[in-house]
Amino acid sequence: MQLGVVFPQTEIGTDPGAIREFAQAAEALGFHHILVYDHVLGAKPRGGEWLGYTHEDMFHEVLVLLGFLAAATTRIELATGILILPQRQTALVAKQTAEIDILSGGRLRLGIGVGWNHVEYEALGESFAQRGRKIEEQIAVLRELWTKPLVTFVGRYHRIVDAGLNPLPVQRPIPIWMGGESDVVLRRIARLGDGWILGGTLRSPFARHPQVPGGYAAMVERLRRYLREAGRAEHAVGLERRVAFGAGPARWTATAEEWARLGGTHLSVATMNAGLARPADHIEAIRRFREALPCPP
């Protein structure tokens, strides 16, 4: 199982040196990947039940940040977890991600999802209601653009006639993982995905996903059933889960062991919301996590 770190978007601050040091520390400590969250705009909370991020939460632009981290590191995988794809222009995302993959020497993993913030969609001029249908077509367009010098694609949301990227990415195609915990998402992953990023998904700013009977084990089994129905091998997709640094060493170990038993391939530690005041504290936190799990299951 591969261990990674969640980039502490909301707490790292704006010092480029601190951002570079965090990524380089993660690489030096032997972590496999850095997972970066995405939001373009934060919204003012809508009432006391709001559970999502707000305008007060800092988010570095994810693709620009990964370009910076590509130059600051040499080995560690760079992953979005997740990029809210339907609120972005597909061809532009294809170009940006291809460039990151080139600059990093083939180290990009693209995690995508539909998101929950309708305010963000409206501000970016995209349809919140159409996001589920759109993302499936976007996946097809991305893979066409990443693998062919010239593409002709005419769909519901895209029209490309004899056009393509130059240069193409190192990975052809770049791996596409998906976030989310609904049944629709699981079926989409089974048909189209390279991996599944679990944990912390919001159904809306007001209500988290209800507890699934059987927990993660039941969800993984459901995904495997959908993979079989789609004609794919049960272990055709990677499985990534997150664990909170604030949960403590005993919980880290228990989570890693449980996830390994379920066939999990990736586990990332999130250091946000643990009372860490400085970027250096986040580096110390991932060092402690790595020492607690020197040989992951």
Model regions and ranges:
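Active-site-adjacent structural elements that line small-molecule/cofactor binding pockets in enzymes
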Residues: 1-297
